[in-house]
Swiss-Prot record:
The modification Phosphoserine is found at S176, S178. InterPro entries: Ribosome_biogenesis_Nop16. PANTHER family: HSPC111 PROTEIN-RELATED, NUCLEOLAR PROTEIN 16. Residues 1-30, 77-120 are annotated as: Disordered. Signal peptide: none annotated. Belongs to the NOP16 family. Present with 2860 molecules/cell in log phase SD medium. The gene is NOP16. One of its GO terms (biological process) is ribosomal large subunit biogenesis. Involved in the biogenesis of the 60S ribosomal subunit. Component of the pre-66S ribosomal particle. Interacts with NOP7, RRP1 and RRP15. Residues 85-98 have a biased composition (Acidic residues). Pfam families: Nop16 (PF09420). This is Nucleolar protein 16.
Length: 231
């Protein structure tokens, strides 16, 4: 026999706390756009799908970190070299020669950002000269089309289809008045004529308090359809 508390719980309108299925909760059913729905991969996350389709999940810069691209192999060089090889002296000699060759390379001031500088040293570590950068972050004289062409990435097929869909001409369908609306406008016209102010203050016919401008637009459309000349 159940207790009084259990019987009250069974009669209560508050639903029981049941276990939710996370897979059903997270599943996305795309119905808004057929192009995106056809190319959506449900095994990927939303951000991964947007990146695959050539779209952006967020218009602004992401506040947090980005997902690591595992397709690119980044080789990490240790800061300190372990002393394991017998040919350490030869390696050090090669490193010094490489450093000297790098130091003798001419630095281009047009490749260094404006406001920054590069120090050029000799093989002994002494400063030879300081090269100040002249490369501007944004050139006002540069053509806008060149900037756009440089910044834009290659469009995917999904983006091209979406642009074609968005560029189609939209056929505007004019709103038609219903029979009840025409009967209501006819009553207003027979009672008040072209006096839209009296129509506005008519509490029996104008129960939804339509404004004078709205009543005028509706009546002009109704007159045009019924062939009534406007005064």
């Amino acid at each position: 026999m159940t207790s009084v508390r259990k019987r009250k719980m069974n009669r209560s309108s508050v639903g029981k706390a049941t276990r939710r299925n996370k897979d059903k909760q997270r599943k996305i059913n795309i119905q808004s756009n057929p192009i995106i729905a056809a190319n959506w991969d449900y095994s990927l996350t939303m951000a991964q799908n947007y990146k695959k389709l050539g779209l952006r999940a967020k218009l602004q810069t992401p506040a947090g970190g980005k997902e690591a691209d595992l397709s690119k192999v980044v080789k990490r060089i240790p800061l300190t070299k372990p002393v394991l090889d017998e040919d350490e002296d030869e390696d050090e000699g090669e490193d010094e020669q490489n450093d000297y060759n790098a130091a003798t390379v001419e630095l281009d001031e047009n490749e260094i950002p404006e406001g920054g500088a590069r120090i050029q040293r000799d093989k002994n570590g002494d400063v030879v000269r300081v090269v100040y950068g002249k490369k501007k972050n944004f050139d006002a004289d540069e053509d806008v089309n060149e900037i756009k062409a440089r910044d834009t990435t290659e469009e995917t097929e999904v983006v091209k289809k979406l642009e074609e869909l968005a560029s189609r001409p939209v056929i505007r369908k004019e709103r038609s008045q219903s029979e009840r609306e025409e009967e209501w406008l006819e009553k207003l016209y027979k009672k008040h004529g072209d006096d839209y102010k009296k129509m506005f203050f008519d509490k029996k016919l104008n129960i939804y308090q339509q404004s004078e401008g709205d009543l005028k637009r509706r009546l002009l459309r109704w007159k045009k359809r019924n062939g009534i000349a406007s005064k």
